Amino acid sequence: MVLQDLPDKKLSFNRTIKYGDLVIVYEKHDAMKAVMVSEDGVVQNRFGAFQHSDWTGKPFGSKVFGHKGGFVYLLAPTPELWTLVLSHRTQILYIADISFVIMYLEIVPGCLVLESGTGSGSLTTSLARAVAPTGHVFTFDFHEQRAASARISQFSHFSQFRHNQPVQSISVLPNRLFVVAN
């Protein structure tokens, strides 16, 4: 079952960085972090200080230099990178397992997915990308802080994060639910 296109749901193909964007700051293969770009923001690390204002207007993937001459790369937040940089508030699934879940459940664009247990949001962001642009992920977590923290990913406009038990909230879902993933 594939849903009709919903005009208010669009993937953003804007490849330049602007204020409010989530950016993955890549120092080296084992040193990355997610940063929300803000007007007064600064990232400081062993390579120098990097002003967020220097990032705006640059394309994702750019190499930017700090005031000491060091550099970092500014990467777009894909689900794969998000899984590597997110705060592990719970045990998470990694890309190999996520790929198997999505394939096994035949999750494709247009599906509606119910996820019970948002956790750190690793699976949620990959599910949201898999169902985009016409599908939707409804995810529930009983822990309020985990549900709130998971909302910041780039794919959050394809997901609804709720703080409560899914059984208590099932009545608020549309009657077009296609896939249920635990």
Name each model-derived stretch.
Residues 120-133:
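Conserved SAM-binding loop of SAM-dependent methyltransferases across substrates and taxa
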